[in-house]
Regions:
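Short, conserved secondary-structure transition motifs
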Residues: 147-157
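Active-site and donor-binding regions of nucleotide-sugar-utilizing enzymes
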Residues: 1-149
Length: 157
């Protein structure tokens, strides 16, 4: 299901919605988002790669695909970042400066599971979110945030 998106105007309003499903090769089996009934189908899991929802100032997925909305249609909303970052040492406070721009986002908060690139990045997310939300939330982040090496079929060397 190709997800529609848009660019934003300077005032934050959405320009017209872009849908690229019709640009994909005919050999691919795709489903138009307008014909897929999320409520009736209720997928076991939905994977998202865009955590920003309404907080991205330049682009946005269609609001239907915001994490808070998708969560109602599945028992397992999974966020996997579309980007890879340089490794962050959890004790390096300077590295935390940019983390609010990709960690404190709705996709992370609403996801049931967050899969990051490494154990070190997992610890950085947990440390940042615990510091931001309070020590009493640490277990929530420890259970929610995982990485490839913790998922048997994704283990990498």
């Amino acid at each position: 299901i190709p997800v529609p998106y848009c660019y934003r105007n300077l005032d934050g309003s959405m320009k017209h919605i872009q849908y690229e499903g019709d640009l994909l090769p005919g050999s691919l089996s795709i489903t138009d988002y307008r014909s897929y009934d999320f409520q009736a189908r209720r997928p076991d899991a939905i994977f998202i790669q865009n955590p920003y929802d309404e907080y991205n100032l330049t682009t946005s997925v269609h609001p239907f695909f915001y994490a808070a909305n998708l969560k109602q249609y599945t028992d397992k909303l999974v966020y996997v970042p579309y980007f890879t970052l340089d490794e962050i040492e959890p004790e390096n406070k300077k590295a935390f400066i940019n983390m609010p721009h990709y960690v404190s986002m709705p996709g992370v908060a609403h996801a049931d599971t967050v899969i990051v690139q490494s154990e070190r990045m997992r610890q950085a997310y947990i440390g940042f979110l615990t510091e931001a939300a309070g020590e009493d939330t640490k277990q929530i982040w420890e259970e929610k945030i995982t990485c490839n090496s913790r998922i048997p079929f994704l283990k990498t060397k």
